[in-house]
Design a protein with these regions (language model features):
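Residue-level signal for the start and early helices of compact helical domains
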Residues: 30, 70, 81, 107, ...
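A cross-kingdom marker for long, charged
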Residues: 86-125
Length: 125
């Protein structure tokens, strides 16, 4: 794995530029690339299942993505979706996935962390 964390302070508009740059650099070194872009935020408190569904639904709507499946993995609420506008995808069973939302409550900080990834979040929950 090669993981690069980039903190964007003025918005996420440049995200695709950084993704292209990472692919280009890794390909120049002959490294087969699989780039995942993830954005993380937090909401105060322990969100209810209903609120998680509402927030993830709004996020998917903004991306033009359709839900493939949702579920609970350990203590995390997980949404797998597909958006025609996102180029890369992975297959899970017969379904293509390229948008992944995970939400989990952090007791120490008292917040629900929300992670939006394309094509899929591939780190520990």
């Amino acid at each position: 794995y090669f993981i690069t964390d980039i903190e964007l302070y003025k918005g996420f508009e440049s995200t695709s530029d950084y993704e292209k740059l990472m692919k280009q650099v890794l390909e120049e070194y002959g490294i087969d690339t699989h780039v995942t872009v993830s954005m993380k935020g937090s909401i105060a408190g322990d969100m209810s299942q209903y609120d998680k569904s509402e927030v993830s639904g709004k996020m998917l709507k903004m991306l033009g993505a359709k839900t493939v499946t949702t579920g609970q993995i350990q203590d995390s609420y997980v949404v797998y979706a597909y958006a025609k506008s996102v180029k890369d995808s992975v297959s899970i069973g017969k379904n293509k996935i390229n948008v992944n939302i995970t939400m989990n409550y952090d007791e120490t900080r008292g917040v629900t962390d929300i992670q939006l990834s394309t094509p899929i979040y591939n780190e520990d929950f």
